[in-house]
Amino acid sequence: MRLLQATVLFFLLSNSLCHSEDGKDVQNDSIPTPAETSTTKASVTIPGIVSVTNPNKPADGTPPEGTTKSDVSQTSLVTTINSLTTPKHEVGTTTEGPLRNESSTMKITVPNTPTSNANSTLPGSQNKTENQSSIRTTEISVTTQLLDALPKITATSSASLTTAHTMSLLQDTEDRKIATTPSTTPSYSSIILPVVIALVVITLLVFTLVGLYRICWKRDPGTPENGNDQPQSDKESVKLLTVKTISHESGEHSAQGKTKN
């Protein structure tokens, strides 16, 4: 029994030693000598594409430190590159001066084939390659101004040109009508002023005529202005007449008396 126990212990010890040696060999195989690791960069010059860098990928295909073959076989390396659509580019060129505007829109479609190739080589794993293609559409709207033969013409939209032209034509026609046809409706000032002047002249004439009438038909200095007022010459003539009549009558009476006697 002791012999059997001793043999069993011997086999167990030998087995454990073998397993430990195998583990050391595996660990030695899994941990390589320090080799130079390089980084793989996938970059594209077209704008809008994201460049991806995989720093964990070694150059000689050996896994990084601290990993075993079984762990590496269970993990899979997947590199995905997202392609982004580029924005629209609007280019405007403008020059000053007497120019004519011309607008044109150009659409350019450029297919972008393989943006990146990511290759990973591992022991016991398959090679994986991903190719992505994106289509970039660049829309360029260009506004150019060309020199015009006439330096004073400003180029604008057709609608504004037509409206401005029609307005100028209407203005010209109205100006011509006003210049050719005289105004038939007189203003109030042209009526009122002559009337006022005529009234002033008439009043002046009336006053002058009345003054002349008074001067011409003025009474004579012999005629009494009032009933009681008489000039001295008239009084004297009346006295003389009365004296003559009285003397004549007295002479007749005396002659008659003489004849009776």
UniProtKB/Swiss-Prot annotation:
The keyword Ligase does not apply. Residues 212-261 are cytoplasmic. Endothelial sialomucin, also called endomucin or mucin-like sialoglycoprotein, which interferes with the assembly of focal adhesion complexes and inhibits interaction between cells and the extracellular matrix. The gene is Emcn. One of its GO terms (molecular function) is carbohydrate binding. Glycans are attached at residues 28, 101, 119, 127, 131. GO terms for biological process: angiogenesis; cell-cell adhesion; hematopoietic stem cell homeostasis; regulation of cell adhesion. This is Endomucin. Residues 1-20 form the signal peptide. Highly expressed in heart and kidney, followed by brain, spleen, thymus, liver and lung. Exclusively expressed in endothelial cells. It is a single-pass type I membrane protein. It comes from Mus musculus (Mouse).
